[in-house]
Amino acid sequence: DGSISATDTHPNPIEVTVLCKESELESVMAAVCKVLSLPSVDARANNSCGLHVHLDMRNRKVDEAYKKLFHSQSIMLNMLPSNRRSDTSPWAQQYCQRNKAGTFSEHDKTSNRYFNINTKSFTKFKTLEIRSHSGTVNATKIINWVKLLTMIVSAEVLPDTTFRSINTFSEFF
């Protein structure tokens, strides 16, 4: 990935891609992060690294999933360090902007991939990519982030519910 910056102590940037079933997330991520933490590997994430999560949309309605993620952005972004939020970071303004279009189709026709919720991955992979989390080799952080995102897109919403932005978990569930 051209956006990853090497350091003097870790001169070889690597990108790790993990594909697994949601039901296997915990065991797979624990194993991957265990290997990355071995002294012989000594993988580390610096500020140029990001955790990008692709959420499978093959069995979900992408329009509804996008709306749920869109209206949950405040919660998602407030959980992250300030350097990952586009309102406080020039880097995030360039590579991870907050989505402003409220519908999937509206966002997809006008945007590039450098948004908190990347809709461009849907055409190629049938996923929505969430780009905002900072890079990490901590399995617990990765697992909890993916579980949160999965809960958001899988939440039951009544047909007559009006989507609105939310700021706390209690408002969402």
Where are these regions (language model features)?
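C-terminal accessory/tail domains of diverse enzymes
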Residues: 1-45, 58-173
